[in-house]
Amino acid sequence: MTLSKYSKPTLNDPNLFRESGYIDGKWVKGTDEVFEVVDPASGEIIARVPEQPVSVVEEAIDVAYETFKTYKNTTPRERAKWLRNMYNLMLENLDDLATIITLENGKALGEAKGEIKYAASYFEWYAEEAPRLYGATIQPLNPHNRVFTIRQPVGVCGIICPWNFPSAMITRKAAAALAVGCTVVIKPDSQTPLSALAMAYLAEKAGFPKGSFNVILSHANTPKLGKTLCESPKVKKVTFTGSTNVGKILMKQSSSTLKKLSFELGGNAPFIVFEDADLDQALEQAMACKFRGLGQTCVCANRLYVHSSIIDKFAKLLAERVKKFVIGHGLDPKTTHGCVINSSAIEKVERHKQDAIDKGAKVVLEGGRLTELGPNFYAPVILSHVPSTAIVSKEETFGPLCPIFSFDTMEEVVGYANDTEFGLAAYVFSKNVNTLYTVSEALETGMVSCNTGVFSDCSIPFGGVKESGFGREGSLYGIEDYTVLKTITIGNLPNSI
């Protein structure tokens, strides 16, 4: 079976496959320059999309700004209807949308289908939240005054998204923004723009007004486009998922207009297994947590801390299970795990692997390049007894390297886990509820998952602390990041009767 047979998409609805930006309800190129979208599994070109200049971004911002003047006055029930339509359309087109993800991202089709279901759930959630944007009534000290608060949409939102979840990272942000009455300008990653364009097509079918949902495209001009979104006074909010370094740049650029920001940045998640944990459960959850997307998710376990009394057994059993993975092209039905996104990802895995080995880590599963499959295929690596001085204890690998560290006490492992500038997610496995509660409170992360390695859901507030960012996506809190709280006072009322 050759990989090249998968390089051109065959979709039930060919209209989902687009190669132009989307502004004001129109498919816009805006330039003769293009960049190529490549299937990371085969290395073959699957699309050529426009390298849009700053002028096109400014056009999209202007359109979103003008549309906001009317969109903000649509009723919550109207917006809920469009959001619900979007949810239904995503599920109706699940196979096509998942195929697009697999071709541009490289993940296995089963994982891609899971992403579409997860992504769609945010439209369903915010369809239900849109009519429930509440304020409060307040009795101030002055007996003749009455105060109440309302939440209003912040305005045009710039949404800058990563490649690892090409659909879900858009919906987590755009669904909340659209629900409260904001308009959006979306900049997808240049490696995975096709999912965003498919979503724009569905947004039109769902009934969203022209100009409320816009998608801009660029590879070489990406820094300029991001800077334009951050510095434009017409853009009132920027939300970004990606690296901490880029987040810091965007934050600096946004300071000139004091924008509302929400960032979901780098992670370095600890996965802690105490000696009393259910070992089978911890192993199954470690596999799901560490190797989902072949380790290319922001909440993947980057550091596994296993109690010294069970570390060798845990490492051996984990390796036995990981050996059963079937690495291959994501569209091959036999494949359980696809490829990594590019050669830089492989280079980082190998750098972290060799550094840990040089410092004394034991190789449990060698892993390595699978060049016979393609340039970006890599078998998982498992190392045990990794020293705390290894680079991987400080840096997020974002790939199929599983380093296992040893610990003896609760205090010791919490110290290890918190010894990082990142604080997105953490995992704790134990049968003792006191251990779970005590460690969860002590961990310096925005989210702690106990006895499960998969926790993300539209109903939970997703976000981090420290240099993993700020703001929350999903849940009843996620909608607040796209609103401003206004206080209204009515004064000089007569005495109460």
Curated annotation (Swiss-Prot):
The gene is UGA2. Homotetramer. The record marks N164 as: Transition state stabilizer. Keywords: Cytoplasm, NADP, Oxidoreductase. SUPFAM superfamilies: ALDH-like (SSF53720). Catalyzes the oxidation of succinate semialdehyde to succinate. Can utilize both NAD(+) or NADP(+) as a coenzyme, but has a 2.5-fold lower activity with NADP(+) than with NAD(+). Functions in a gamma-aminobutyrate (GABA) degradation pathway that allows growth utilizing GABA as a nitrogen source. Functions in the GABA shunt, which allows to bypass 2 reactions in the TCA cycle by removing alpha-ketoglutarate from the cycle and feeding succinate and NADH back into the cycle. Inhibited by AMP, ADP anf ATP. The keyword Cytoplasm applies. Its EC number is 1.2.1.16. It comes from Saccharomyces cerevisiae (strain ATCC 204508 / S288c). The active site is at E264, C298. This is Succinate-semialdehyde dehydrogenase [NADP(+)]. Belongs to the aldehyde dehydrogenase family.
